[in-house]
Amino acid sequence: GHTIMADCLEYLLEVCDTSDHARVDSFQMGMTEEGILEQCLCGEPVIGSSFEKVKLLDRRDGFYGADIVEGGFDATDRELQSVEMDQELCVTPEFPYNWMYDGKKTDCAVFELKITCRSLFLIYKDSGEVDVGAADVLVDGVFRFRADPHVNNGLHCNAALVFAEEEAARHTVCIRIAEEDLDKKFTILGFGYVE
């Protein structure tokens, strides 16, 4: 691991030596590193800006353009991926304001979200536990994909693009527990949307 890290740092220094921002003429023009960075950030995005203003939708941070029917997703998952945040040494659980289907209300194993937006991400919990099942994601009654929490078989947060459109429109998103997994758990950690 240390050899790889050293090689990466050596490569970084080589690239810095040959890049435009570190050349002598930049310093002769009186540009500081901050000025060069500001100039670079003012340009057009290299890949695009479709998801530049993604906002979180969860139990706590609602959205006036969204109507939610929880169905059987009325529990809150407390076993979450945790990370160090804001220079704190103790870990903080990610997405604590979630919707969990606990496998007990098999007659209402559907979560429905009506939302007006351009793009929508589903953020769901990945897990290696055997009591966790998959869910089908439908948009306006059309199947989009199956959200399978066993993709990585570890405690992670998965983000999946549900739809991305040019103009905002009203959509009905249903997250339905797979028929064979009705007695298993599934956690919607939240949604990312672009108005």
Predicted feature locations:
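Conserved catalytic region of serine esterases and O-acyltransferases that act on ester linkages
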Residues: 3-195
